[in-house]
Amino acid sequence: LAAMMLLSALTFQSCDTDNDTDWDRVFPNALVTVKKSGDACYLQLDDNTTLLAKNQHPTIFDGKEVRALVNYSQTSEKSEKYNQVIHVNWIDSILTKKPVPSLGSDIENSEKYGNSLVEIVRDWVTVAEDGYLTLRFRALWGGQKVHYINLVTGVNPENPYEVELRHNANGDPQNYWRDALVAFNLNDAVPDTGGKTVKLTIRWRSSQGYKKVDFDYCSRKPISSPKMLEGYSQEGRDIR
């Protein structure tokens, strides 16, 4: 699992006793959407802020649009098109997917998308922005089989902004709790909010029963031909 491996790696680095370690560069200082425009690679920091990554090529992550954790430094350069010009110290992609449609019933959704326990963790990376819902989630792992995580739309006919997080442990032994990250592209998956902020409700089956939480959500401005890389993980592939 890329996200889990990343977090573990960062934890390991934090135990390094080397006095030369630059701790400001060990941990991520931003959650971004990686985008390209012509021959430029830029990072969408939030709904209004763009960062031109001068030391990154637009073909990073195969030229696909993904959410990512990044550690960057500001530069003194100016740009007429972007809010800031930055130097990327390191960047690591997050599993980035499109939501899936409800099959019409809880039984059908459980058979297709799973009904394993999952927890959503309150964290700075658990956020709805730039047309994405990014989640830090917690689940039981055994390390033997691939897990699947999906966001199901159309679960409430009366509210198109209600979605459901589904986890399929795929028969993996439930030995230990571990955290991971996933980002869902909500653009074209839920109705455009027309510039307004609405409540996006997400529900899930936790170890304490079913839960719900609301996010403030506003559709982003359209971009030309965004390319998604579904299930992309840079360092591991045991979650899809």
Language-model-detected regions and their locations in the chain:
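Sec-dependent N-terminal signal peptides
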Residues: L1-A9
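Bacterial signal peptide processing site
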Residues: D16-N19
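C-terminal motif of bacterial Sec signal peptides marking the signal peptidase cleavage site
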Residues: L10-S14
